[in-house]
Amino acid sequence: MSEVTVRQLADVVGTPVGRLLEQLREAGIGVDREDAAITEAQKLQLLRYLRHSHGASVEIATPKRITLNRRSHSEIQVNAGGGRSKTVNVEVRKKRTYIKRSAILEQERLAERQREEEEAQAGVQAQQEREARLIAEEEAKRQAAEEEAKRQAAEEEAKRQAAEEEAKRQAEAQVKRRLDVEKKPKNGLEPARTEKPASRKAKPRFRSEDRESEQKQRGTKFGRKELHIAPGKAGTSKRKKFRPQKAAPAAKHGFERPTAPIVHDVSIPETMTVAELAQKMSVKAAEVIKALMKLGIMATINQVLDQDTATIVVEEMGHKPKRLQENTLELELVQAEQEVSRQVSRAAVVTIMGHVDHGKTSLLDYIRRAKVATSEAGGITQHIGAYKVRSDKGEITFIDTPGHAAFTAMRARGAKVTDIVILVVAADDGAMPQTVEAIQHARAAGAPLVVAVNKIDRPDADPDRVKQELANHDVITEEWGGDTQFVNVSAKTGEGIDDLIEAILLQAEVMEIKVSAEGPARGVVIESRLDKGRGPVATILVQSGTLRKGDILLSGVETGRVRAMLTERGQEIIEAGPSTPVEILGLSGTPNAGDEAVVVPDERRAREIAGHRQAKEREVKLARQQSAKLENMFNEMEEGEIRALNLVIKADVQGSAEALSDSLTKLSTDKARVKVVAAGVGGINETDVNLAVASNAVIIGFNVRADAAARRLIAEKGIDLHYYSVIYNAIDEIKGALIGILDPEYREEIIGLARVDDVFRSPKLGAIAGCLVIEGSVRRNNPIRVLRDNIVVFEGQLESLRRFKDDVQEVRAGTECGIGVKDYKDVKVGDQIEVYERVRKEPAL
C-alpha cells in the first residue's frame, strides 16, 4: 500500500485527524483534507520533521545488525533392533548474523583512534620516565660526591688523631723507661708478676662491639695491650673524650599537677546513676558512694539517684550543681498553643462536697431531675460524676464527689478543677469529719464556699447549730459578718433549691470566669474506666478551647484520636466547649484521674511526649525503690516475721481502684500488712488470675466480674475471689481476713496454788509433795510452776494427783493432796506449786 489517506494514517498512528493535518502543514506538505492521499516520500518528510522538532537525528535510524534464526524439521528412520525401526524427529537450528558494513568501518575507525591515543600517551609516559631517571642519576652522583668528601675528611681526622696518640705514647714510654732504670734492683733480678685470670665477659649484643672488644684484648705481639706501657699503668694515660649529651625529649603527655582543687559545673538531670554522677565530677565512683554513705544512703554503682540527692552530693564534694529541666517537650507543647485574645464567659464548675449520707447526690438529683442516688450501690456515691445543668438564668457544671473517708483523693481532685464548692451539711447531723476535710480541700484549691444546709424538712433539724459548728472552722455566714453564703435546702421537698442556684450564679458572676473558647482544647480527667465493648473511656472536663471529634488527645502517658464524644446523658456530640464534661473514646489506655488532657497538633508529637513521660515515670519509680537504704535493712530482716496478705484489685473506674487500694493498704500494722500486688480497671481476666497465682494473692472485684476463661482458671487453681459493690464491706472483710492470718495469742491464767507441807518418797514416782490447796483448784495434767521464796525454780507438768491413795482429777481449796511433779525431785517443804492453764485469745490488729 503505497498511498494512504490522512484519516487512515491518523488511525494507524493513533492521533486526531486535525492534529495530523496541522503537523503536515508545519512539515511543508500541502495536504488539507481528510481524504487526501499521502505518498511514502511525504511520510518520510513528516517523520524527519517530527524527529527534528523532538531534538533527534534527522536521519532515519536503520538497523546495524540483523540476526536470522532458521529452523528445519525432518524425520529419520533408525534401526531399533529385532527387525524394528524407530522414527526420530530431527530439528536443525541455524543462526546467521548480518552486520552492516558501515558499522564495521566505524568500529575500525574507533579502534584506530583509540590505538593512536594509547601510543601518544605511552610516548608521553616514556618521556616522563626518562626525565625522572636522569634526575635520579644526578641526585645519586651528588650524594656520592658528598659521601666521598665526608669520608676523606674523616680519614684526615683519623690520621691526625693517630699521630697525636703516637707522639703521646712515645713520650710516656720515655718516662717509663727512666723510672724503670731508677727502680731496678741491684742484683738485677725482677720479681715475677702474678696476674689473675680475666673473667669471661658477657657476650656483646652486636657483632661490631664483639670485634672491637677482640681487637682491644689482642694488644701487641709482645702480649701487652699498649706499647711501652706497663700493664699496671695501662689505663692511667687515657682520658675520656667529652661527648655532649643529648637533652631528654619532653614527655608528650606530661601535665602539671593542679595546686588547687578543680571545681566542675555538674549538670544534674531528674534521675541519674552513681556512675554517671562520678563521671561528670571526674572522680571515682567509690568517692561518690563514700559521700552517700556519709549522708546515710547505702548505694551501689548502678543505683539511680533523684535530682535532690544528686544535688546534695555534688555540693558536699565541692562542685557546683546545675539542675536540668527535662520537660523541654512539655514547654514546647505549651508554647505551640495558639494564643487567642478573645475571652468568653464560661459556665461555673461547681463541686458538691460533704460528709457521707448528708444528701449530696439527692440534692444534685433534684436539680438535674434525675434519680442517680437510687442506682448507687449501698445508697452512697462511690464515683466522681460530672453533669451540666441548664436553667433559665444560666448553665452550671456540677461535679459530685464521694463523701466516704476512703475517697479523699477523689475529693481533692474535684476541688482542684472547681470554681465554687457547695458544702452540703445535714441540719440534723452537723459538721462531721469529711465536712472538715472538704473545707480544707476547698481552701487548698482557693475556691469559695457556698454552704447548703440540707434536710431542713426533718423535725430535729437545727440550722443554727450547723452555723455554730462551721464557725468553729472559720466558715462564717454573711448574717454574722462573714463571707460565706448559707442556704437552707431540702433535697426531698425541693425547698430552697432555686435560692441555691441563684447563690451559685451570683458567686460566679462576681468571679467573672472567662476563658478562651478557640484554639486547642485543654482539660482534666475526672474519671476513667475500661468498657468491655468500647475500650478505654475517660470522663474529661474541658477547661479551655474547643474539643472536636477527630482531635489528637494526650493525657498523661496515654494518647489517641477522639473517636466519639458523649454527654452525661449518653448523647453523641461533635464538639465540646469550656466547662463541658464529656466521655471520650479512642485513647490507648485508661489515664489516671487528675491527669491533664491537651490536644496535640500531630500524632507523632503526641507519641513522642507520651513515651518521654513514660520513661520519666519509670525512672522516678526506680529511684523511689530504696531497697538498699540503711533504714530499710532492718525492716527487710523483720519482714520474715510479719504476715502479709497479697491482693489483686480490679475496679470499674480508676478512682475507685485508687481509693480501695489506699484504704486497704492503711489496714497494715506491725503484725500483718496488706500488699496490693496490682490495681487496675476493667473486668477480671486470665492475666489477673495468673498474677494472683504467682503472688499467692486474693482477687477483689469492685463492681466488676470475671470472664468465663478467668472463672475456669480460678476454679482450677483454687484462687480466692471476692466481689464487692460497697467499699465498706470490702474494708471490713479484708480486715477480718488480715486478723485470720495472724497466729493465735495465748494468755496464762492461774487456777490454783498449793503449799508443800511435807515430802514423801515413793518407789514408783519418786518425791511426792504433801500439799494443802490454799487458792483455787489443782487439776491434773495442767502445767505448773514451783516457787521457792516467790521465785520460779521449775516449770513443768503435774504428773500425779492423789487424795488418800486415790487418783483424782481435781482438788479444791482447803483440801490436802499429794502432788507428783514430772521430772523434778527437788521439792522442799515450804515451796509453793502454782497451777495455770493457757487460754486462747483472738488476735487483734
Curated annotation (Swiss-Prot):
Region described as G2: 379-383
Keywords: Cytoplasm, GTP-binding, Initiation factor, Nucleotide-binding, Protein biosynthesis
Binding of GTP, residues: 354-361, 400-404, 454-457
Region: G3, residue numbers: 400-403
Primary location class: cytoplasm
Residues covered by region (G4): 454-457
Biased composition (Basic and acidic residues): 139-198, 206-228
Location of the region described as G5 in the Swiss-Prot/TrEMBL record: 490-492
Keyword Protein biosynthesis part of the UniProt annotation: yes
Keyword ATP-binding in record: no
InterPro entries cross-referenced by the UniProt entry: DNA-bd_dom_put_sf (IPR009061), EF-G-like_DII (IPR053905), EFTu-like_2 (IPR004161), IF2_assoc_dom_bac (IPR013575), IF2_II (IPR044145), IF2_N (IPR006847), P-loop_NTPase (IPR027417), Small_GTP-bd (IPR005225)
Localization of this protein: Cytoplasm
One GO molecular-function entry: guanosine tetraphosphate binding
Domain (tr-type G): residue spans on this chain: 345-512
GO CC, alphabetical: cytosol
The organism's place on the tree of life at top rank: Bacteria
Region described as Disordered: spans on this chain: 139-253
Sequence segments annotated as region (G1): 354-361
Family recorded in the similarity comment: Belongs to the TRAFAC class translation factor GTPase superfamily. Classic translation factor GTPase family. IF-2 subfamily.
Reported function: One of the essential components for the initiation of protein synthesis. Protects formylmethionyl-tRNA from spontaneous hydrolysis and promotes its binding to the 30S ribosomal subunits. Also involved in the hydrolysis of GTP during the formation of the 70S ribosomal complex.
Protein's name according to its UniProt entry: Translation initiation factor IF-2
Natural source organism: Nitrosococcus oceani (strain ATCC 19707 / BCRC 17464 / JCM 30415 / NCIMB 11848 / C-107)
Gene: infB
